[in-house]
A protein has these predicted regions:
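ATP-dependent adenylation/nucleotidyltransferase module used to activate substrates
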Residues: 1-155, 165, 174-175, 181
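AMP-forming adenylation/ATP pyrophosphatase catalytic core
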Residues: 39, 121-355
């Protein structure tokens, strides 16, 4: 009997191609779309009514059943709520990480296993593997370096990886579009989504005010000597590396270096001051066997960043220190630092501060 796979369908070409690939491999495939929003004023965003309708049409075209799993309350609490609390604490979160952990490979996987499915699958550009020597399931980068999404999956557990199939990760984006076009899928040329789904216009301040009831509190811009340079509009309006929209007159370009929630200040400096050679991080997730000694890796602190050689040193309390061979620009509290050993994702953590 064919193994049963539940595919998370977003309405996009990658998840549709995922269905086609799994069908070719002989799996019994069903589709599911996660409802993330009750409202209809966010067309074209992940989990929207438009996505649900399109996913249903594409599923029917491929001859697979399709259902909708309502996770609106969980999404509001664990993703949108966490986004608000992190911003209010002076950090810059990546909500896609929370969505993958809590919804796609949390609630969706639990539902699938409870309803007789053997695996779940998504259209992520990453791969899964198994290391017989350690007995551990592995996460590997996708073969398309330009589309690789392993960075946002570093929190995967062994249980999740054991029930995960990622066929799209074996292909390039052009190959995936060609596969969908050959089948005649309506979404073969659908553009990739870019924005945070619940802040599609990029106005974080408005979202924090309307959803989180956050009223930004103005405070001081200061330099590294403590000198006040001007007034800011509230910590939530800024992130490390930002230059535009500061409203500060100076004889040189100024950038946001960091934010201090305790004192409600934003530290400004020149571009050279944005570079740091080390960081501290917590909430560590290891996919490989957790190391007891310093581990040589390549690492990156942003999704689109190139990796750099580094050493990860385990600390007391489950934290890590990461020392880079070359200084890194705009290391940002709240973002993820992800570690690689070749193509294998070793693990990752949430950045606490640059050193």
């Amino acid at each position: 009997m064919a193994k049963k796979v539940l595919v998370g369908m977003s309405g996009g070409v990658d998840s549709a191609a995922c269905v086609l690939l799994l069908q070719k491999q002989g799996y019994a495939v069903s589709g599911v779309t996660l409802r993330l929003h009750h409202y209809k004023d966010r067309p074209g965003t992940c989990g929207s009514a438009d996505d649900i309708e399109e996913a249903g049409r594409v599923a029917a075209q491929m001859g697979v059943s399709h259902r909708v799993l309502d996770l609106c309350d969980l999404f509001r609490r664990e993703v949108m709520g966490h986004f608000v609390s992190e911003y209010c604490a002076g950090r810059t979160p990546n909500p896609c990480l929370d969505c993958n952990r809590e919804l796609k490979f949390g609630a969706m996987l639990d539902w699938a296993l409870d309803h007789g499915f053997d695996y779940v699958s998504t259209g992520h550009y990453a791969r899964v593997g198994f290391d017989a020597a350690s007995g551990r399931h592995l996460l590997l980068r996708g073969v398309d370096a330009h589309k690789d999404q392993s960075y946002v999956l570093y929190q995967m557990t062994q249980r999740q990886l054991a029930h995960l199939l990622l066929p799209v990760g074996e292909y390039s984006k052009p190959e995936i579009r060609a596969l969908a076009a050959d089948f005649g899928l309506e979404n073969a040329q659908k553009p990739d989504s870019q924005d945070i789904c619940f802040v599609p216009d990029g106005d974080y301040v408005r979202f924090l005010r309307e959803f989180g009831g956050v009223t930004p509190e103005p405070g001081d811009f200061v330099d590294t000597s403590g000198r006040v340079l001007g007034r800011h509009r509230g910590l939530v309006a800024y992130t490390a590396g930002q230059r535009k929209g500061l409203g500060v007159s100076a004889d040189r370009p100024l950038y946001v270096l960091s934010k201090d929630a305790k004192h409600n200040t934003v530290l400004l400096g020149d571009d050279a001051e944005l570079f740091s050679s080390a960081l501290l991080a917590s909430r560590v997730s290891w996919i490989v066997t957790p190391p007891a000694e310093p581990l040589r890796v390549t690492a990156k602190t942003r999704y689109s960043q190139r990796e750099s050689a580094a050493t990860v040193t385990p600390l007391d309390g489950g934290a890590v220190r990461v020392d880079f061979d070359e200084p890194q620009r705009a290391i940002t509290a709240g973002q993820a630092v992800v570690f690689y050993r070749g193509d294998v994702v070793a693990g990752g953590a949430t950045i606490d501060k640059a050193l």
